[in-house]
């Protein structure tokens, strides 16, 4: 809740009239630039029993008496230090303002605190603005009024005319949220499981800020690092940030398994909020780790932020999305021109194209239970570095950042030729998989078998034997013929 004015009060007395009394129920207070869906409530502190004056209202005589229920406000200085700004005459009961007191904003806040503590009834029914524009309180008895707004914005009053106009000078706060993507901040990014994800939330404040509480909710795929929170303040018109001391706020970590929908809250102390000017920016940075519960694909992993302020008001929710992807692989061979699953092929996945096992960085994995497909999750502490295909020839590697990957066959099935070079796979920021310039899903890897070579003792050798025998026999016939001729 916030008091609707810098001075916090307004007197409704006659502007043109030179005299009047409390029974004149024709006072009007109009709030200009009222904010849509904000509620305005008016309380009367003093009755103006009568007045008389000349041309200048400040030179007139005014007889104020205390409204019922406000006596403790003037006397309980420990709870309401500015209550003694009003001086009540013991004999007559009339009230005057101590002219040496000028902290009107503090007085208004104490008066509002008293209203809540004592459940003081409003002077008129509260009004909620249906649109940005004006709201009015009409038919008001003459008196000294306090106006309260749920918007958390202060307005100034510098008139005691019978028809009083209040300017709603300030808007409501706003929240912007981004996530680090490379060297920039955007509303979305991509990451591998195990990567740190850095967030930045900016609250653009307004004067009269009250009850600022930042609420942050992370999906189950993000593990919040509660030591990572840093809060800075950048004053309006400036370009440098300064740290906000941790005495100015409290952080509450919420158990995600509970029914509370938030991951953490940051509640800003009112003393800090009181220092904020229009368009000052509170900049909060923090991080989380993408974990094994991460949603795979374009649905992504959400981080939502909103600010509650004033009396149960809240900003629009600001959201970022962190996506992580998968590479589905199908190992096959062609039999009768049909793709046939091939088992016992072994692969590694890396972020570099080096083929020497001792030098390239293999992505570590952990096995995940699948249905018809073997599934593996990225895990920097995982013990799986090679995947061997089963009877389906299929497997998936999940939890991958966008980027370029190299799938290397380290062992081929018996009787098949091993791939001589890695398969280059590119994952886009939207999860599209490209191989050799073509979008694919899954990544298909074919193995071929070579034709069989002739073996020793086969038909070819037999032919040599036959020809050899024929030659030997032929030689024998020649020798016999020659002997007979002799």
Predicted regions and their residues:
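Solvent-exposed loop/turn and edge beta-strand elements of beta-rich ligand-binding domains
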Residues: 1-486
């Amino acid at each position: 809740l916030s008091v609707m004015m810098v001075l916090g009060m307004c007197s409704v007395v006659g502007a043109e009239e030179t005299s009047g009394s409390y029974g004149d129920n024709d006072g009007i207070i109009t709030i200009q630039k009222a904010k849509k869906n904000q509620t305005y409530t008016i309380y009367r502190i003093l009755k103006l029993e009568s007045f008389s004056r000349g041309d200048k209202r400040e030179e007139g005589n005014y007889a104020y008496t205390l409204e019922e229920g406000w006596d403790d406000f003037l006397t309980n200085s420990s709870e309401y230090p500015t209550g003694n700004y009003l001086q009540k005459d013991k004999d007559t009961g009339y009230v005057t303002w101590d002219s040496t007191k000028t902290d009107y904003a503090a007085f208004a806040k104490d008066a509002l605190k008293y209203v809540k503590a004592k459940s003081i009834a409003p002077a008129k029914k509260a009004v909620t603005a249906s649109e940005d524009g004006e709201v009015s309180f009409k038919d008001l008895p003459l008196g000294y009024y306090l106006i309260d707004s749920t918007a958390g914005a202060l307005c100034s009053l510098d008139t005691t005319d019978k028809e009083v106009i209040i300017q709603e000078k300030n808007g409501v706060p706003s929240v912007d949220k981004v996530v680090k993507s490379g060297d920039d901040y955007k509303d979305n990014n991509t990451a591998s499981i195990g990567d740190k994800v850095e967030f930045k939330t900016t609250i653009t404040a307004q004067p009269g800020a009250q009850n600022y509480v930042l609420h942050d909710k992370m999906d189950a795929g993000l593990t919040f690092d509660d030591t990572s929170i840093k809060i800075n303040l950048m004053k309006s018109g400036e370009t440098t940030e300064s740290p906000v001391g941790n005495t100015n706020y409290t952080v509450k970590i919420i158990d995600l398994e509970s029914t509370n929908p938030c991951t953490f809250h940051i509640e800003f102390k009112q003393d800090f909020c009181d220092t904020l000017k229009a368009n000052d920016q509170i900049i909060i940075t923090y991080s989380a780790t993408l974990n094994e519960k991460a949603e795979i694909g374009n649905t992504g992993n959400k981080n939502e932020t909103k600010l509650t302020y004033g009396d149960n008001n809240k900003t629009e929710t600001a959201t970022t999305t962190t996506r992580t992807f998968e590479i589905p692989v199908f190992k096959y061979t062609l039999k009768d021109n049909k793709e046939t699953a091939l088992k016992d092929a072994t692969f590694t996945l890396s972020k570099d194209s080096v083929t020497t096992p001792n030098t390239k960085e293999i992505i570590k994995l952990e096995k995940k239970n699948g249905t018809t497909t073997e599934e593996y999750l990225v895990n920097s502490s995982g013990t799986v570095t090679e995947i061997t295909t089963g009877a389906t020839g299929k497997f998936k590697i999940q939890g991958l950042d966008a980027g370029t990957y190299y799938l290397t066959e380290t062992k081929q099935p018996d009787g098949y030729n091993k791939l001589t070079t890695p398969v280059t796979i590119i994952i886009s920021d939207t999860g599209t998989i490209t191989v050799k310039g073509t979008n694919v899903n899954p990544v298909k890897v074919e193995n071929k078998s070579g034709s069989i070579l002739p073996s020793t003792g086969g038909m070819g050798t037999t032919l040599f034997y036959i020809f050899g025998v024929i030659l030997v026999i032929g030689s024998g016939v020649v020798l016999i013929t020659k002997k007979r001729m002799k």
